[in-house]
């Protein structure tokens, strides 16, 4: 099975997950829903995650996810530059497209750091249009960047070894505070929205924090995929719960709790 068709089958399977269900479906249930054999599905999951379907999806059960909730103590060692959104007009954005285990990403950076990461879903013109509409940069220049290379190395290491490049954040002070707070979540571990709210000094502001999490411009490098609802289920994700699972699972599997 080609890497593209393998990813397609895995994404279709992950798309069958209900974001707020405590127990994931079984391999048999998924193969029946997808019209494939359990063997085909297991082979796709082993190629993607190194484990067969049922063992992989156990990591997304609420029983397991509850154990991953981690105190927000140390933060990743990364340089952060905070700017208001309207200041993006003062910068040229250098962008390019990169194939990753999570699909094609469009990365963009200013002269100061990585500023945008978008899942293109193979719609490059749509990704460019979104950057134009949201940031109105002074210029968009297709080019590689050392910031992009550092970010991709970090992603390949599942956030464990390679450091992040400087991150140039365009947002309100509150948004930037929430985005910075997510850098306290270790790879292979998760937190609740309420935990982030407490960390940024807004213990009753979980809903506002959730909105800021959803506006994260640098997923998966700022790891909003590690934030869960109080029910300890997968929860929602701007790019869809299937992609959240695709990004989160390799981290959970590489840092097992048993």
Which sequence ranges carry the predicted segments?
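Short glycine/serine-rich loop segments
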Residues: 204-246
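Basic nucleic-acid-binding alpha-helical/helix-turn surface characteristic of O6-alkylguanine DNA
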Residues: 1-204, 251-258
